[in-house]
Amino acid sequence: MSEIHLDDLDRNILRLLKKDARLTISELSEQLKKPESTIHFRIKKLQERGVIERYTIILGEQLKPKHLALIVLEVGKPVIEDFLERYISYISSTLSALPGVLFVAKSGEDKIIALVGKNNKDELVKFIEENITSIPNLKHIQIFPITEIKKGEDLTGFLAEV
């Protein structure tokens, strides 16, 4: 994939749309002091080049999970090492299907990172006990309750399910 070059106008359009994707071309034009045709053309080009993939929403506070935990799972190596990748894939897809699991990623060859969110602390603890700590063949589990988000507070509103 070739490197994407953005000029100041492209960056300003993206910055405004990231803040509020509901802005109309007319409103963008007014804020950026550029003709509507220019804004329309630039947005079309940004979409064609894959810079803008889609427009989405961020759920409000009422629908965001109130209690979050970042969980790091270290998977024990199976007797047949070739099965490690398949087992990690299986755990990842199983976790991804569970309600309240907002994010799942692989780290290194034997770790899985998951972000879990629930509406109350007891529900979160119960979920972790029933669904995470019960996974067989885990070498180590680290649970990091998130007490305060310093940057990226919209992330849970983006990832949360309805």
Curated annotation (Swiss-Prot):
GO terms for molecular function: sequence-specific DNA binding. Residues 25-44 bind DNA. It comes from the Archaea. It comes from Pyrococcus furiosus (strain ATCC 43587 / DSM 3638 / JCM 8422 / Vc1). InterPro entries: ArsR-like_HTH, AsnC-type_HTH_dom, HTH-Siroheme_Decarb, PF0864-like_C, Tscrpt_reg_AsnC-like, WH-like_DNA-bd_sf, WH_DNA-bd_sf. The keyword DNA-binding applies. CDD domains: HTH_ARSR. PANTHER family: HTH-TYPE TRANSCRIPTIONAL REGULATOR PTR2, TRANSCRIPTIONAL REGULATOR, ASNC FAMILY. This is Uncharacterized HTH-type transcriptional regulator PF0864. Keywords: DNA-binding, Transcription, Transcription regulation. Residues 6-78 form the HTH asnC-type domain.
